[in-house]
Design a protein with these regions (language model features):
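Intrinsically disordered, low-complexity acidic regions enriched in Pro/Ser/Thr
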Residues: 1-123
């Protein structure tokens, strides 16, 4: 099992690296992107309506946690890539067997899917 962070990247990307991270996102025209950031693959997507609180569920619709979003973005990354822990709760750090960021995606309704977990951002 791999520990995985799901949530707003602003809570886990170091302050010294935040601008560089944002520049990498701004250089991409898609609403979702997978890229290498400082040696770690990360999936980043825009939420449907920007900032807010979004719920993380598993495939049985069990509420796992609530994700605060202040940058209008959600990310999925290995916990090894976390640079800081700023205001995240246990619901944001989950275990995914054989985690591979290439298997993370969002659909046309801005619902994020990562393994058996999902986050709907279109309310």
């Amino acid at each position: 099992m791999n520990r995985v962070y799901i949530g707003d990247p602003c809570y886990v990307i170091g302050d010294d690296n935040w601008q560089n991270f944002c520049d990498m996102i701004d250089n991409n025209d898609n609403s979702q992107v997978i890229f290498d950031f400082m040696g770690h693959n990360i999936f980043v997507m825009q939420t449907k309506y920007g900032d807010g609180v979004y719920e993380l569920f598993d495939d049985k619709y069990t509420l796992i946690g609530k994700l605060c979003v202040d940058s209008g973005l959600l990310c999925v990354m290995s916990f090894d890539g976390v640079q800081k822990i700023d205001g995240i709760d246990d619901g944001c750090v989950i275990e995914i067997k054989d985690f591979n960021v290439d298997n993370v995606y969002s659909d046309e309704n801005a619902t994020l899917f990562a393994g058996k977990y999902f986050v709907k951002t279109d309310y």
